[in-house]
A protein has these predicted regions:
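Extended, amphipathic alpha-helical stalk segments that mediate dimerization
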Residues: 1-193
Length: 193
């Protein structure tokens, strides 16, 4: 009986050792996968950034001149590095707020894309996202607390979404918790009817 017990114990120990080795291999494989995935995502981000930079360069000269000290045009690297700050996002929003009537719709669309891209990229610096884009939905009732009405009606339904707003997110205790905006830094720009 003790002979059989020793064999079973030896077999069990071998299985445990084998299981532990496989867990270590799986963990190493997952780390490699995460690294490759991160590199792939980073390459995708660079391709998107390059496209946005090229589209930015194609904008009207008059529009680009409004952003010349904010989104640097000297080269791709300057453009990219200039976008990774909340002050840049605030400045873009402030200019659009004042100049939206003088910005052609196709350029406004490109600026929205650039703004969204940089907000999303800034989130990648953190384990959990720190910022959220805020949009407005057409035909919903205007909310003066969470939206900025460029038509100065300050009531009625939203007729046009002009530009994103953004806010900071609450810290999460659990990564599966829903994102909750803690503070609105810039409200979405809208026109009401």
């Amino acid at each position: 009986m003790s002979e059989k017990y020793k064999e079973l114990e030896k077999s069990n120990n071998e299985l445990i050792k084998d299981k532990n080795e496989k867990e270590i291999k799986a963990e190493k494989l997952m780390k490699k996968y995460e690294k490759v995935k991160q590199e792939r995502d980073s390459m995708g981000d660079l391709l998107v950034a390059r496209r946005l930079y090229n589209e930015y360069l194609e904008m009207n000269t008059e529009v680009k001149s409004k952003f010349k000290n904010i989104l640097l045009q000297k080269d791709f690297e300057s453009f990219l590095s200039s976008g990774y700050s909340t002050s840049t996002m605030d400045n873009i929003w402030d200019i659009v707020k004042v100049e939206y009537k003088n910005i052609p719709s196709e350029n406004l669309e490109k600026l929205r894309e650039i703004f969204k891209f940089f907000i999303m990229q800034m989130n990648k610096k953190f384990k959990d996202p720190n910022f959220a884009l805020i949009e407005a939905t057409l035909e919903e009732e205007f909310d003066p607390v969470t939206q900025f009405d460029l038509s100065q009606n300050s009531r009625g339904k939203i007729a046009e979404f002009i530009f994103y707003g953004y806010g900071t997110l609450e810290d999460k205790t659990n990564s599966k918790d829903e994102d909750i905006i803690e503070k609105i830094k810039k409200r979405p720009l809208v026109l009401t009817k």
